[in-house]
UniProtKB/Swiss-Prot annotation:
GO terms for biological process: viral life cycle. GO terms for cellular component: host cell nuclear matrix; viral tegument. It is found in: Virion tegument; Host nucleus matrix. Keywords: Host nucleus, Virion, Virion tegument. It comes from the Viruses. Belongs to the alphaherpesvirinae HHV-1 UL55 family. This is Tegument protein UL55. Its main location: virion. The keyword Coiled coil does not apply.
């Protein structure tokens, strides 16, 4: 089996231009069945639910942070398929090692990032309901949303922003190489 060079992975990454700070999801999941389990926020007056789509290599309780991501300056939201591709990229072992370096320690699982959804049917918006898709980072720490946990979420935010800018830089470099090749042929 041949490995794909990281530069090719970044070229295929969706064009993510902004990653918002983390929003903690007020629920816990069991890692072994978090892929398809929807949880309702017990503290929310509205009917708000979370789907984290976590595919974790360990078992036990997890808690999650949600990152809204945008594609451009108009804050267009990426498609779910683009978010899945981005989550696959940031979960890629050589890329994930960068997060471990930022956190200063090993992660408990091999896939802490996934594509998640927040759905609100409260009628708070003019449309009556809204759905936001984004990137979810899940954590296995003993004390959910403790200082240590938030430091991990902060490192995850830095990691997502770094990888998204790497994808943008890789595409820009590829365009420059392509222009140079065209000039040489002429």
């Amino acid at each position: 089996m041949t490995t794909t060079p990281l530069s090719n992975l970044f070229l295929r990454a969706p064009d993510i231009t902004h990653v918002a700070p983390p929003y903690c999801l007020n629920a816990t999941w069991q890692a072994e069945n978090a892929l398809h389990t929807t949880k309702t926020d017990p503290a929310c007056l509205a009917a708000r639910s979370y789907l984290v789509r976590a595919s974790c290599s360990t078992s036990g309780p997890i808690h999650c942070f949600f990152f809204a991501v945008y594609k451009d300056s108009q804050h267009s939201l990426p498609l779910v398929t683009e978010l899945r591709n981005f989550a696959d990229l940031v979960n890629h072992p050589p890329v994930l090692r960068e997060l471990e370096d930022k956190r200063g320690g090993r992660l408990r699982c091999t896939g802490p990032f996934s594509c998640g959804t927040i759905k609100d049917v409260s009628g708070a918006s003019p449309a009556g309901e809204y759905t936001i898709n984004g990137i979810v980072y899940h954590c296995h720490c003993r004390y959910p949303f403790s200082k240590t946990c938030w430091l991990g979420a902060s490192a995850a935010l830095q990691h997502l922003r770094s990888i998204s800018s790497s994808g943008t830089a890789a595409r820009a470099a590829e365009q420059r190489r392509h222009k140079i090749k065209i000039k040489i042929k002429v």
